[in-house]
């Protein structure tokens, strides 16, 4: 059939080998589809392909030993296999470098973002601590006074004001009592002026009687009549003077009554106003104290949340170190790629060697390929294990 069509198709063993080599990559594609990381999928695919290639290349020694003259006459295309392997390893190495660059760029941006977030959280915690020190009164404040000192100073000032007002009210009460005593004294003075009026009237009456008697005496009573006139004049002046005193004392008496009433009202008003103001201000200070306690509670809660967020950021920054492990694993993959490339070069060089040397050289290349390389990462999680630092 192949001769009739004029087309040279691959042999069945070659198709079987190609199918076996593509099987690991198909499995890795399925793992990537379910969410496995691309760099881990590439590593698994490469190691699986390498193992499959080693298994397929175990046969050359036995095949050469049992080959018939017709098989020896056919020369394998080692250079073509070498070029195919070299192209494949170059593509794998390019993908590994691309993954490394993408990881490095993304992790650097994430790390910078987390470090900036950590700095802002530290600033927020510092502000919270300054508010706590200012509101709870336990810390030293560089400028001004804290809230507790403000409340305490306000209470002391208001207490002094209330005490001064109460003392003024008490003094006003004492002044009212003194004014009452003065009012009583003025009442007595008014009573005395009335007595003086009565005396003046009696004196005037006596002077009038004396003048009458002097007129009856005639010439001998003339001198006595003069004295009687003077006594009457003195009595009149005493009456006028007593009236003037009574008038002034009445004015003073009314003024003192008005002053006593005003002082009494002021004392009562100051007392009630001071007590009422004291109660209201004490209620306001109690409300401020309750508000202060609530504010402190909220600030403490914010400080606790900031601490937890900071710890989460630190844990995230620590977890970002997986980029170092990924880079080292990708570097390890490039080493294996280089060994695979050297193995391909060795296969390509077999064309220039006698066929009798092929089994030995292939076995030597396979042995070199099987030689293990030290792994820089000995863990499968970022939480445990060690990483070889660059």
UniProtKB/Swiss-Prot annotation:
Disruption outcome: Mutants have general chemotaxis defects in media that are low in magnesium.
GO biological process annotation, one example: chemotaxis
Record field: transmembrane: 36-56
Gene Ontology CC annotations of this record: plasma membrane
Residues in Methyl-accepting transducer domain copies: 173-265
PROSITE patterns for the chain: CHEMOTAXIS_TRANSDUC_2 (PS50111)
Membrane-topology annotation of the record: Single-pass membrane protein
Single GO MF descriptor: transmembrane signaling receptor activity
Keywords, ordered alphabetically: Cell inner membrane, Cell membrane, Chemotaxis, Membrane, Methylation, Transducer, Transmembrane, Transmembrane helix
InterPro entries: Chemotax_Me-accpt_rcpt, MCPsignal_dom
Subcellular location: Cell inner membrane
Disulfide links within the chain: none
Pfam family, one: MCPsignal
Chief place of localization: membrane
Family: Belongs to the methyl-accepting chemotaxis (MCP) protein family.
Role this protein plays: Involved in chemotaxis. Required for an optimal chemotactic response.
Protein name: Methyl-accepting chemotaxis protein McpA
Source organism per UniProt: Pseudomonas aeruginosa (strain ATCC 15692 / DSM 22644 / CIP 104116 / JCM 14847 / LMG 12228 / 1C / PRS 101 / PAO1)
Gene: mcpA
């Amino acid at each position: 059939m192949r001769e009739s069509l004029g087309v040279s198709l691959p042999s069945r063993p070659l198709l079987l080998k190609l199918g076996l080599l593509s099987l690991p990559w198909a499995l890795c594609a399925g793992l990537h589809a379910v969410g496995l990381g691309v760099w881990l999928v590439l590593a698994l695919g490469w190691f699986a392909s390498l193992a499959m290639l080693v298994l397929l290349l175990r046969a050359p020694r036995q095949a050469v030993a049992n080959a018939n003259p017709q098989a020896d006459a056919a020369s394998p295309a080692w250079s073509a296999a070498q070029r195919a392997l070299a192209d494949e390893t170059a593509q794998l190495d390019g993908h590994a470098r691309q993954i490394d660059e993408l990881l490095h760029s993304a992790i650097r941006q994430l790390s910078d973002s987390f470090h900036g977030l950590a700095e802002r959280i530290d600033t927020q915690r510092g502000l919270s601590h300054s508010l706590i020190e200012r509101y709870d009164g336990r810390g030293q404040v560089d400028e001004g006074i804290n809230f507790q000192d403000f409340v305490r100073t306000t209470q002391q000032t208001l207490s002094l004001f209330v005490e001064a007002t109460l003392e003024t009210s008490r003094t006003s009460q004492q002044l009212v009592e003194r004014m009452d005593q003065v009012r009583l004294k003025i009442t007595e003075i008014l009573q005395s002026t009335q007595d003086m009026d009565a005396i003046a009237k009696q004196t005037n009456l006596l002077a009038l009687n004396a003048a009458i008697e002097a007129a009856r005496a005639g010439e001998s009573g003339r001198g006595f009549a003069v004295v009687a006139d003077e006594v009457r004049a003195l009595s009149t002046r005493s009456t006028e003077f007593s009236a003037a005193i009574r008038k002034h004392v009445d004015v003073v008496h009314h003024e003192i009554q008005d002053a006593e009433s005003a002082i009494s009202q002021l004392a009562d008003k100051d007392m009630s106003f001071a007590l009422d103001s004291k109660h209201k201000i004490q209620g306001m200070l109690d409300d401020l104290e309750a508000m202060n306690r609530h504010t402190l509670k909220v600030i403490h809660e914010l400080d606790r949340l900031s601490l937890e967020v900071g710890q989460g950021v630190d844990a995230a920054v620590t977890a970002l170190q997986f980029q170092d492990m990924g880079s080292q694993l990708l570097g390890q993959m490039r080493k294996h790629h280089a060994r695979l490339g050297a193995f391909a070069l060795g296969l390509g060089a077999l064309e220039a060697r006698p066929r009798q040397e092929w089994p030995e050289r292939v076995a030597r290349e396979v042995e070199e390929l099987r030689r293990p390389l030290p792994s820089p990462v000995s863990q499968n999680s970022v939480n445990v294990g060690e990483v070889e630092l660059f």
